[in-house]
Amino acid sequence: MRKFETLLLLSPELAADAREALLTTLSGVVEREQGSMITADHWGMRDLAYPVRKQMRGYYVRLEYTAPGATVAELERIIRISDGIFKFVTVKLADAVEEVA
């Protein structure tokens, strides 16, 4: 299993309970596909550099998880069909890095 990170930009109009329900759904997808959620880091409401869907603010959430590669495809499919998610990006995190003295 590999370690991944997904950064989500959510609509500022999503209520807190709707936002939590969405994140619960996404973490459920990861766990259903034999992955495990490490952390869900809420960065909060931030100003955007340019309008996204006519909004100048967005709510950022960073998800970190370990999962097989097929899980990422399923997670991104669910993200694409979900309302309230403006943008997202998923990256594979590096394996353990050795420090050079």
Swiss-Prot record:
Question: Under the cellular component aspect of Gene Ontology, which terms does the record hold?
Answer: cytoplasm; ribonucleoprotein complex; ribosome
Pfam families membership: Ribosomal_S6
Q: Would the keyword Ribonucleoprotein turn up in this protein's UniProt record?
A: yes
Q: Name one GO biological process term.
A: translation
Q: Name one GO molecular function term.
A: structural constituent of ribosome
What keywords appear on the UniProt entry? Answer: Ribonucleoprotein, Ribosomal protein, RNA-binding, rRNA-binding
Entry's InterPro entries? Answer: Ribosomal_bS6, Ribosomal_bS6_sf, Ribosomal_S6_plastid/chlpt, Transl_elong_EF1B/ribsomal_bS6
Q: Report the function annotation for this chain.
A: Binds together with bS18 to 16S ribosomal RNA.
Alphabetized PANTHER family for the sequence = MITOCHONDRIAL 28S RIBOSOMAL PROTEIN S6, SMALL RIBOSOMAL SUBUNIT PROTEIN BS6M
Q: What is this protein called?
A: Small ribosomal subunit protein bS6
> Lineage from the top down?
Bacteria, Pseudomonadati, Thermodesulfobacteriota, Desulfovibrionia, Desulfovibrionales
